[in-house]
């Protein structure tokens, strides 16, 4: 297996499969607006996920369930306008694909047409197989999502690690293989044991991107607000914080407010 890194001017679904076959890890982060997406893309992140986690970090909801298709399209279109290199993947939100394959296709088409995104992501396995096939048959690239699927939080009752038991682990492997067979270009595995994630990654040729799934998969994804330390209340075991922006931003904004109160801002050099 080659470890030579290819310089991709534009990441495509084909690029990601090549990266896996060449042993090159895939980086993936969320973004929900133009400015953040521009920074993420300029930094060289391969895949930019417009996640339904916007429901949490942008709108303040406790779960991902409330965000609507219209809201996802708004966020996605903002991101797409900023991105020049990365592959933009958009979550189909809860309620936009679960009822039947035709609804799933309509939702996916709206995202692609109205935002200009490059692919969609759906949560689930065999239970949404027909919806995935319907979307793929329309020429829309699909990424799967298995393990802890946040849209099913009320079914699980907890955000704890999934697929610890043999039966659930076997189903997860079968679902991952099904996703590859029907034509998905990749799959996200969330919060499952590292050894199981490795088995999945080794059993399929499409990239496996982990979040809380160990280091033996083909790439990693995090929510950007979490890895930049913009939320002090969320600190799962899998999260590595690269900055403490909550503290730094609070300090900077506090200093600005103090400077305004004291008439220190603006000074003579900051006026026309």
Swiss-Prot record:
Named cofactor requirement(s): Mg(2+)
Pathway assigned to this chain's UniProt record: Cofactor biosynthesis; (R)-pantothenate biosynthesis; (R)-pantoate from 3-methyl-2-oxobutanoate: step 1/2
Superkingdom per UniProt: Bacteria
UniProt xrefs under Pfam families: Pantoate_transf
Keyword Cytoplasm belongs to the record: yes
Comment on bound cofactor: Binds 1 Mg(2+) ion per subunit.
GO cellular component, one term: cytoplasm
Function: Catalyzes the reversible reaction in which hydroxymethyl group from 5,10-methylenetetrahydrofolate is transferred onto alpha-ketoisovalerate to form ketopantoate.
Name recorded for this polypeptide: 3-methyl-2-oxobutanoate hydroxymethyltransferase
Organism in which the protein naturally occurs: Flavobacterium johnsoniae (strain ATCC 17061 / DSM 2064 / JCM 8514 / BCRC 14874 / CCUG 350202 / NBRC 14942 / NCIMB 11054 / UW101)
Lineage, highest ranks first: Bacteria, Pseudomonadati, Bacteroidota, Flavobacteriia, Flavobacteriales
């Amino acid at each position: 297996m080659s470890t030579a890194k290819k310089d991709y001017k534009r990441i495509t679904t084909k690029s990601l499969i090549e990266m896996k076959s060449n042993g090159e890890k895939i980086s993936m982060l969320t973004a929900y607006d133009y400015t953040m997406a521009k920074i993420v893309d300029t930094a060289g992140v391969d895949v930019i996920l417009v996640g339904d986690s916007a429901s949490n970090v942008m709108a303040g909801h406790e779960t991902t369930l409330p965000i609507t298709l219209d809201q996802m399209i708004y966020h996605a279109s903002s991101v797409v306008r900023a991105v020049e290199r990365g592959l933009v993947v958009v979550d189909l939100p809860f309620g936009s694909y679960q009822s039947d394959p035709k609804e799933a296709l309509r939702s996916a088409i709206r995202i692609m047409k109205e935002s200009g995104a490059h692919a969609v992501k759906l949560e689930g396995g065999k239970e949404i197989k027909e919806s995935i096939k319907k979307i793929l048959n329309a020429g829309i690239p699909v990424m799967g999502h298995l393990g802890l699927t946040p849209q099913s939080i009320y079914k699980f009752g907890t955000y704890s690690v999934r697929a610890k038991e043999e039966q659930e682990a076997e189903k997860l492997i079968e679902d991952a293989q099904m996703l590859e067979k029907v034509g998905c270009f990749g799959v996200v595995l969330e919060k499952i044991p590292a050894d199981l994630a490795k088995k999945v990654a080794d059993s399929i040729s499409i990239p496996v991107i982990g979040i809380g799934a160990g280091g033996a998969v083909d790439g990693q994804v995090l929510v950007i607000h979490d890895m930049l330390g913009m939320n002090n209340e969320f600190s799962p075991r899998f999260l590595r914080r690269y900055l403490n922006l909550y503290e730094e931003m609070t300090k900077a904004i506090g200093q600005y407010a103090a400077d305004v109160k004291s008439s220190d801002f603006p000074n003579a050099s900051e006026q026309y």
